[in-house]
Design a protein with these regions (language model features):
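Short hydrophobic/aromatic helix or loop-helix immediately within or flanking a transmembrane segment
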Residues: 60-93, 100, 104, 151
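Membrane-embedded helix bundles of polyisoprenyl
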Residues: 28-35, 101-116, 125-200, 212-253, ...
């Protein structure tokens, strides 16, 4: 539990370490659910029921309930299928599941954010990050009891499907500051060589085998999940392609000396299933065999796969999958729906009624000012702004956080793309508040153990930024 990415411990058989992680994850889940249930007394009004059934909060929720019941346009959609499956499993009706499930899944979003902060540097500080995300106004308002809609999964899946690639990248790739040091050392300055030369060599020596079967399985499964999410929402095809491009870019730019081809090969374990589906998980199985370092035949296979012309052919295949379908046309169409002002329509004649554009009339797609956007990240503008600035620091120290960059962009683009995007900024601000505070406390309180510092970080953030807004 030191100031290192959790991926460093992936190869260690440290049962206590992982049990501690499970414990704090359950604490995050329990606290998030308890805080979410503070709204439960408000539902005791009989007017909020229809017979024995609670009324759902949005028309979209009834859209998915209808699909789960077997009629309407939502039949066969994953949201309706999931609702039907959970209702059958629990022996109840879809509308009851649609009422309770938003509060439950939003708690698992808190757990995923906790896991991200754990991976980026501190297990215990992740508790505060998870709760800050779960209770962020922009996410909370769209995931209250009865709000069964795609907002639940559009934040959950991007956090889930990128966690393993981020950990893998941080485990086997160079940190940005290390790259800068190498550039300075390579410039020929004698003082720089004396200052950093030995430390650079030591950090290169700790890098292990990026094709270990555990990593390959995690990358492959994350890729299949990424591919599957594209059936849930139109935003996922863009996010998955960004993730593939980022992993390839990091393998090219941040690879230690002599390991670029090996990292490009390992990145394919994620890229191919992400773009091609479960069928390409077979390539991950091939990489698992190539990762066995003790077998001479497997070593030869790995050497052959790492040849430049083989990698070029494989990545050309990734490129063809990347551009398959009418991707560019779809992207242009989707952006125009969000960003272009629709023309006002109406009838002819002097007394004709003038109708506002339907899309721009909806609250969730109205453009917001920057201060309004910050208020959706956290009720205090100053805290939200500090979180955004802190996230920049996190990116510099933990390049795996680059996988979260699209969420930051979507959150800030609420000024042009509408208020429904604000929830994407919640985990960004949470990460940007917790980790920098944890690192600063480590510097100030050097005698404290890292786990105690993490607990102190969570306690301070919960007392200052959560308790005042939940009447604790």
């Amino acid at each position: 539990m030191t100031d290192k990415p959790v991926s460093v411990y992936f190869t260690a058989e440290n049962r206590t370490f992982w049990l501690h992680g499970l414990f704090w994850g359950l604490v995050t889940l329990g606290l998030a659910f308890a805080l979410r249930m503070l709204e439960w007394p408000c539902w005791q009004n009989p007017e909020y029921r229809l017979g024995s059934e609670w009324l759902l909060a949005t028309h979209d929720a009834y859209h998915w309930v209808a699909g789960a019941e077997g009629f309407g346009h939502a039949v066969g959609h994953p949201m309706a299928v999931m609702l039907r499956g959970m209702a059958d499993l629990l022996g109840t009706y879809p509308a009851a599941v649609a009422f309770w499930f938003p509060a439950l899944l939003s708690c698992f979003v808190a757990v995923i954010v906790y896991a991200w902060v754990w991976a980026l540097g501190s297990m215990e500080a992740g508790v505060a990050a998870g709760l800050l995300t779960s209770l962020a106004p922009g996410f909370l308002a769209r995931t209250l009891l009865g709000y069964y809609d795609t907002d639940l999964v559009t934040l959950f899946f991007p956090l889930l499907m990128t966690l393993a690639p981020a950990c893998w990248a941080m485990r086997y790739m160079l940190l940005p500051q290390l790259i800068l040091k190498k550039l300075i050392v390579g410039s020929g300055l004698a003082a720089a060589r004396r200052l950093w030369g030995s430390s650079l060599a030591e950090q290169d020596l700790r890098l292990g085998n990026p094709l270990r079967w555990q990593w390959v399985v995690l990358l492959g499964v994350s890729g299949v999940i990424s591919w599957w999410t594209q059936e849930w929402h139109s935003v996922f095809p863009y996010l998955t392609r960004y993730n593939v491009c980022l992993l390839a870019f990091m393998s090219l730019v941040m690879a230690p000396r002599g390991r670029r081809n090996l990292l490009l090969l390992g990145s394919l374990a994620y890229a191919l299933p992400t773009l091609g589906g479960p069928l390409f998980f077979g390539f991950s199985a091939l990489l698992m065999t190539a990762g066995w370092t003790r077998a001479r035949q497997m070593y030869r296979l790995r050497q052959w796969l790492c040849r430049p012309w083989v990698l070029i052919l494989l990545w050309l295949g990734v490129g063809s999958l990347f551009l398959s379908g009418e991707l560019l046309q779809t992207i242009t169409h989707q952006l125009s729906l969000y960003m272009k002002k629709a023309e006002v329509s109406g009838g002819s004649g002097a007394l004709a009624l003038i109708y506002p554009p339907a899309g721009q009339a909806l609250t969730e797609v109205q453009d917001l000012g920057l201060l309004a956007v910050l208020a959706y990240f956290h009720p205090w503008h100053e805290a939200a702004a500090l979180g955004l600035l802190g996230f920049v620091w996190v990116i510099f120290r933990r390049p795996g956080a680059l996988f979260l960059l699209p969420l930051a962009a979507l959150g800030l683009l609420s000024t042009k793309m509408g208020g429904r995007m604000v929830m994407f900024g919640a985990p960004i601000v949470a990460v940007g508040l917790t980790l920098p505070l944890y690192w600063m406390l480590q510097r100030l309180l050097r005698k404290l153990r890292p786990n105690v510092t993490g607990i102190l970080t969570s306690a301070l953030l919960l007392a200052l930024l959560v308790a005042p807004f939940v009447n604790i």
